[in-house]
Amino acid sequence: MKKSIVFFEAKGGSDKGPDGYRKDTMPMVNALKAKGWNAEVIFFTDDILRNESERNKIYEEAKAKFDGYVSRVNPGNLKEEKLYFDVLRKLCDAGLVGMPHPDAMIGYGAKDALTKLRNTELVPTDTLAYYEPNEAARIGVKWEAGGEHDFKKNFPKTLAKGERVLKQNRGSTGEGIWRVRLEDASAYGKVDLLPLDTKIICTEAKDNHSENRQLGEFMDFCEVYLKGDNGMLVDMTFLPRIKEGEIRILMLYKTPVYVVHKKPAEGGDAFSATLFSGAKYRYDEPKDWQSLIDWFLAQLPEIRSKLGNYDLPLIWTADFILDTDKNGADKYVLGEINCSCVGFTSPAEFMEKIALMVGDNIVEIVEGAKK
């Protein structure tokens, strides 16, 4: 074993500090060095990825020098993400330990992960994922006209029953996440299929602004979210208790590190838990949410098996919203998993401690894989 790890980053982007690195990268590098390991950062750009010889140069260097890689590339920072994933996949095939494996990034990080978990305690059974036929074929999903993955056939049915949330797969900070409800709240449950001229109110999580639209026109607008590789929409029940806050668990591999309580702005149609939209964040110890933590950790084996049986990501988050069960008791619903490039720069006092824990986890993962 070489006792050597490479961190992959993308040049540029709003997630970088003045030194050009992500703010949480060098603390992890230094934590590994303090344990007697070598750690280096290699940058990717779209130009490098498009250039086969440059791409291969990084591959050969990484294969020769390192036991594993840690991917610190934010979704959207590289247009050539597919080529980047190809490099990572090739490195995993060559024996490097992927943190995470690119297919695990897709499995855990794509919004349709929720539909793979809908027959568990975590996700409501009426959660659906919509694709264009070509994208469904590319990712191995069976698409049929009028079937469960057909957006325009299904959304008028799900919305007829109650308020929904539509989430695009790409984007961040709430862009392309819409709360959709009928203008006439008394009309739910009256028909199985809403007509296309049904008047609806759409609120975007980006900034909580609302728009009055017609159902057919809004669905036409949403087709942009289905275009291209990884294009999809996830359709979920709207949970009104989001007003009480979203609960995010930051995980290091199998260990919860802290919990963020994200309370949406007060008033109006606000439902977004993003800072940009005015949500307030509070950072808690895992023990402050012990019942949620214990329940979630008990679900990890099933989550792992249903999302492709890849190892858990190195750094990842799970977001929960409160709901009420049929007996009137609290229950938690999984709203999203993030794993592509989760940061831990806030709160600042946690960063060094978490970086040391990440270093310990990297060593444990690599040593376990190399045995």
Can you say where each PLM-predicted feature lies in the sequence?
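Extreme N-terminal starter segment of soluble prokaryotic enzymes
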Residues: 1-6
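Short hydrophobic segments within beta-strands
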Residues: 7-10, 252
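Short, solvent-exposed loop/turn segments at secondary-structure junctions
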Residues: 12-13, 47, 75-76, 105, ...
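Conserved N-proximal alpha/beta basic substrate-recognition cap immediately N-terminal to
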Residues: 12-146, 153-154
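Structural motif
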Residues: 69-72, 165, 234
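Domain-scale recognition of functional cores that engage charged ligands
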Residues: 78-79, 100-118, 126-154, 159, ...
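Phosphate-binding site of ATP-dependent enzymes
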Residues: 162, 170-306, 333
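C-terminal active-site "lid" helix and adjoining low-complexity regulatory extension at the edge
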Residues: 287-294, 298, 304-317, 321-371
